[in-house]
UniProtKB/Swiss-Prot annotation:
GO terms for molecular function: L-cysteine desulfhydrase activity. It comes from the Bacteria. InterPro entries: Ser_deHydtase-like_asu, UPF0597. Pfam families: SDH_alpha (PF03313). The lineage of its organism: Bacteria, Pseudomonadati, Pseudomonadota, Gammaproteobacteria, Aeromonadales. This is UPF0597 protein AHA_4077. HAMAP family: UPF0597 (MF_01845). One of its GO terms (biological process) is L-cysteine catabolic process to pyruvate. Disulfide bonds: none annotated.
Amino acid sequence: MRHIAMKAQWTDFITLLKREVVPALGCTEPMSVALAAANCRKLLGQVPTRVSVWVSGNLFKNGMGVGVPGTGMIGLPVAAAVGITGGNPDAGLEVLKALTPAQVEEAKVLLPAIKVDVKDVPDVLYAEVLAQVEGHSARVVICTDHTRIILMERDGEVLMAQDSAPGVQIQAAPSSKPAMTLREIVEFALQVPLAEIDFIREAATMNQALADEGLQGYGLRIGKILTEQVERKLLSDDLMTLAMRLSSAASDARMDGAMLPAMSNSGSGNQGIAATMPVVAAARFLQASDEQLTRALVMSHLVAIYIKTYQNKLSALCAASTAAMGAGAAITWLLGGQFEQISHCINNMIGDVSGIICDGAGSACSMKVSTSTSAAVKSSLMAINNLHVPQSEGIVSDDVDQTIANLGRLSKQGMLDTDIEIINIMRAKQQGKAE
């Protein structure tokens, strides 16, 4: 194979992948609260007697009903409690990796002293924890990114503060375009020297372990149920079923608090699962080589990041469905498709699943991951037969990059009221006032 020189953009792509595809233990929104709480405990030097937590509406939405790893419990108060009693303030999204049963019991005692409320802030991702004990206090604020601490205070003294605008933005401003195109991503994935992207294989290893755990029976048991139906001959042991089984099983385990990390994408474990496991399933089913799997995973994850750049970090649009579009692109390539067919696949998926809402993280996420995975396989099979949604329909354009931008516009501008109503409904449920 001839040597291909690295392009400057390719180096940027590798940096982007290494920043956005990282391990995360537990749903990332509660982990932000746990991380802030763990840092409060570090500043105080002791367990507080009162803890106040304020979060953005979107973080509240994604933390209300999801399992906290190692606890058997759900919700943001639990995340704050175990963050204080057993969180590692230096471990980022793996803040609860070393949590012990004794620390969980200690957290249960602390739970009545924890209050969580929604704060009206401009940032969709915001977590603030104030911990108090015997005349002392500590405050930590995380903003714009799941692990980005922008404020640390002890006894009212500011120890660290920075502007809430991120130092490195991956999200596109409404009037700007990301510094990449789908064609550039595909070219990179297929031509970059293999040694430069070998690291992406860890996503397959990590998320496969999560899928194996999920098949034991977690959450809604979607992956386990699908597997049982294959054994009963009610479902075929085909590509689509395998992809759905592995993807939903990994999500089942993650959403139900399994003590295993997921390789995330753009700050979300389910996005990482949706970008990884359908590709792993396709590579296994098609008996692809290690190199093919590696390049397919890079294509999938980078496409998922690209599509996400047009959207807010948290929104009313299910991000697992958009991450699965990356998987669809990679599966199309594994099936022999070229750039034209890869474009068709993404257009097909946007024409199919672009309306799935995010009504918070929870066990039902595995259903949405499963649905999006099936759409990825279906769209790939259509694409390699040169079948695609025509540009005359809906938000689909002949130019796939424009279609992706249209989806971002739908998410970022068109679904704002949807997001508000979802949050209002969930808050009313929590307060026992849902009508």
